[in-house]
Amino acid sequence: AMNLIHKGETQLLEANTLNGGQLRIAASDTICRYFLVPYLNKFHKLYPNVHIKVTNSTSIECAHILENGQVDFIITNYPNSGLLNTHSVRAIREFRDVFVASAEHFPLQDKTFTLTELLDYPIMMLDRKSTTSEFLHSMFQKSHLDLVPEIELSSNDLLIDLARIGLGIAFVPNFCIPEDEKQLFILKLSETLPVRQLVVVHNENLPVSQAAKQFMDML
């Protein structure tokens, strides 16, 4: 509660100026690296006196951080089980998740897979604390399948590195795959996985600072 009171007082003082104050954002490592950095760069050039604080955590944990009033807003994957009714959600882009494998170690470029057939291969994915894990497990559960990953990590980049050396088939957002990728290929599926979204979320119960408004308007 004291966090929320202090935050409200600070935002009132900063309401009409961007000559100081702070901007507090939470996002996952993947979203920070592949989406957020260019916007942070632009905002910092426009408003160099605003102190920017970025908190790195899983998308689910980011929702809890937002609810506690520790940040102005979060950028997260959606759906996200951590989001509450008090959270205002706006979509900013869509993306697809893909299974990728090394062509050298898994020469399967011509094969089209069902989810059932994928279970015959070592699947690598983010750990259970992530929205990506929630999403993939729910897809398998809808088909009455039990997914038991070979490897669970907290980094999409590391999953991609392990896929390149043939340790398994990695499940990652498509925007993590370099455009000039030569070692990995995207597996073809007989079932189309739903599109997910990146969303910006703020707590409707808290005042939004001028800095946060300006940044969210850039997205």
Language model features with spans:
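Short beta-strand->loop
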Residues: 88-98, 174, 182-197
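Alpha-helical "hinge/linker" immediately C-terminal to small N-terminal DNA-binding modules
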Residues: 1-14, 98
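A late-sequence structural motif
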Residues: 35, 186-219
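Hydrophobic hinge/microswitch elements
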Residues: 58-71, 77, 131-187
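Flexible hinge/capping segments at coil-to-helix
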Residues: 16, 86-123
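Central regulatory/effector-binding core of bacterial HTH transcription factors
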Residues: 20-83, 152-153
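Short, well-ordered beta-strand segments
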Residues: 22-26, 74, 124, 170, ...
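Secondary-structure junction motif
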Residues: 107-108, 121-143, 208-216
